[in-house]
Amino acid sequence: MSLTLAIYGKGGIGKSTTSSNLSAALALKGAKVLQIGCDPKHDSTFALTGTLQPTVIDVLTEVDFHHEEVSVEDVVHTGFAGVDTLESGGPPAGSGCGGYVVGETVKLLHEFGLYDKYDVIVFDVLGDVVCGGFSAPLNYADYGIIIACNDFDSIFAANRLCLAIKQKSARYRVELAGIIANRVDYELGGGTTLLEQFAETVGTRIIGRVPYHDLIRRSRLMGKTLFEMEGPGKEECTAPFLEMAEELLNRPRSTVPKPLGDREIFNVIGGWR
């Protein structure tokens, strides 16, 4: 059975860039990887393929949602390091339910038998929305992973995601592997001080620290992974992903988080420095 990861975090926190580089690192460690983008923007896998690929919803719409007329090749495309990629897509802006599309994508995965083909499946999930459809990847995941940075809004969203994982863990096998600290800046951003206090409070840990570096910004613009980039800082930027990949492949320590109440976290974060 595949190791299945569901990656969440506040909108704009860098989930797609982080997920793509983690998928690349897992592949470079020898794993056969499928990354699934669960966002109507359908740009999750851009860094792996260098293009915006057709989405599941695009393909299903063309065949009037007759699943039997869709092949694996219609929706799965191979990117850097042999990582296979799939974009679920979503309805037009202002209409429909994006969560429904995630459900359709999961259904297709089962019909294609893809869960048995891959060593690792990575779900890159829309923002901090954890309504029914967008929380569906947690039903299938071994581990949830939260991406956050060292600020209030990010930590508030992370706490809500901890609540979703806790609720899902009562019925499914999923637990929280930990938090990936993104855009870590020890000079201007306080490093990971707040995140470390939050992680300890809810009973988890930081599993990786990704620096705030211009190489990461440029890689996203160019549609490349960090492993394909050249220039100062490459090793600093790629090392955290290789370290996380190694730990995840060896099944990391995980927990069922103990989230704070919304009002409580407002009070608690205000007391952290």
From Swiss-Prot:
Reaction equation(s) it catalyzes: chlorophyllide a + oxidized 2[4Fe-4S]-[ferredoxin] + 2 ADP + 2 phosphate = protochlorophyllide a + reduced 2[4Fe-4S]-[ferredoxin] + 2 ATP + 2 H2O
Entry-linked Gene3D superfamilies: P-loop containing nucleotide triphosphate hydrolases
EC number of the protein: 1.3.7.7
Cofactor or coenzyme needed: [4Fe-4S] cluster
Binding site for ATP: 12-17, 41, 182-183
Disulfide bonds: none
Annotated positions binding Mg(2+): 16
Family: Belongs to the NifH/BchL/ChlL family.
Designated name of the protein: Light-independent protochlorophyllide reductase iron-sulfur ATP-binding protein
Protein's gene: bchL
